[in-house]
């Protein structure tokens, strides 16, 4: 039985990692380079090495004078994440990486290859304070926020691994990034938004992915959703709703006690209107808990009323977690749920589940060494 944990919005005051180039915007980069006594053009040069060439080791930056590489490395390229181990499944198409941060904190990212794309699922916090009882990350509690650079470096490392053919399937290109790993992204708001800008800005300011290929998920921090809408980004917003009624959601997603289903959907509509993007509604289907036909009908009705055509439901067969008494709904129940949501005029599909065997699927990340 899952133990009821308190909600934690503010991360413990643990020391953040040393400053890294990826923490800095272009003006801050120039200032940092000037402080090292180097000419201003080195700022963009270093950024191109990191973002365009995916190089994080100044010793390998051949356009940088050998005499200053050590100094630059110490000041702007501290080692943030060290891989502890890689686990693969799905014929090698899914790879989970356990990372150790500078202070020993553990976190995970998951790279998934498909015939037409490669998607990286990244963490924004070590652990999570949202306390959802069916999620292994939420049951582990919150250790600390990740820095902007720790978030970005997960992406750079995956892009480099794909480019170099270090993952199954040969050389490839990273096409999508989803903030669906460990943590509640909007509880680490400032650093996550900065990371999104680094991931999507063209070189020398970032990795150059399209904003439309980035998804930011949330359990429903309504004020932060509105704030994100006002950033004028065109990333996809994914809301982990999991049930359409407040009574059950208060238990399944404890943050609902702070912001109700109606408030979350109002904020999601504001995001859809501002961004012009369809909102994704995530719904983990749990046997005999939230899979009843009436809940499917209510979900469809509420979403159609709140979001009209600007919504898509992703049904997720519940992934097993240690100690949980819950499991996935039977396939016929899942099929009927989809049919009923569609009957309300709302787009709905079942998500392709990857990584169950290596605890890399949605809700399974626990960063266990």
Swiss-Prot record:
Disulfide bonds: 121-362
GO molecular function (one): rRNA binding
Residues given in the record as [4Fe-4S] cluster binding sites: 128, 132, 135
Cofactor: [4Fe-4S] cluster
Enzyme category, top tier: transferase
EC number, as in UniProt: 2.1.1.192
Source organism per UniProt: Rhodococcus jostii (strain RHA1)
Cellular compartments annotated: Cytoplasm
Location of the active site: 108, 362
Biological role: Specifically methylates position 2 of adenine 2503 in 23S rRNA and position 2 of adenine 37 in tRNAs.
Signal peptide extent: none
Gene name of the record: rlmN
Binding site for S-adenosyl-L-methionine: 183-184, 217, 240-242, 319
A Pfam cross-reference name: Radical_SAM
Matching InterPro entries: Aldolase_TIM, Methyltransferase_A, RNA_MTrfase_RlmN, rRNA_lsu_MTrfase_RlmN/Cfr, rSAM
Family: Belongs to the radical SAM superfamily. RlmN family.
Name assigned to this protein: Probable dual-specificity RNA methyltransferase RlmN
